[in-house]
A protein has these predicted regions:
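Conserved binding/recognition cores within well-folded domains
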Residues: 1-77, 81-83
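C-terminal structural segments of small proteins and small subunits
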Residues: 90-91
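Short, charged, intrinsically disordered terminal tails
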Residues: 94-105
């Protein structure tokens, strides 16, 4: 069965055992595309890679908390928590600065 989703409804995307899943506020959908294929298509829509196996919708993050070791802990709108690895934390912090600059203009 195929579903048409509005990308704004997606909280995050992750991969488990080479299977890709899209998480909305209420439902989880399996997707035939690989994570890197989705990442390429969603780059300009505020989706950011947060680890080897996950991409988040920046607009659906409720809070961001720094953790030991340079990681970040994200709490999504539905209360689920995801870690941003050190490798991807730099891009997340840059996105935050970009948003702050646009607000202060």
């Amino acid at each position: 069965e195929q579903h048409l989703l509005d990308v704004r409804d997606i909280l995050y995307i992750d991969t488990v055992d080479k299977r890709t899943f899209l998480y909305t506020g209420k439902t989880v959908y399996e997707c035939a595309l690989r994570l890197y294929e989705l990442e390429d298509g969603l780059q300009n829509l505020d989706f950011l890679r947060v680890g080897r196996s996950a991409i988040v919708n920046f607009r659906r993050i409720r809070s961001i908390r720094p953790e030991l070791g340079g990681r970040l802990l994200l709490t999504m709108e539905n209360g689920e928590q995801l870690y941003v690895s050190r490798q991807y934390a730099v891009a997340m912090k840059e996105k935050l600065r970009e948003v702050e600059r646009s607000i202060l203009k």
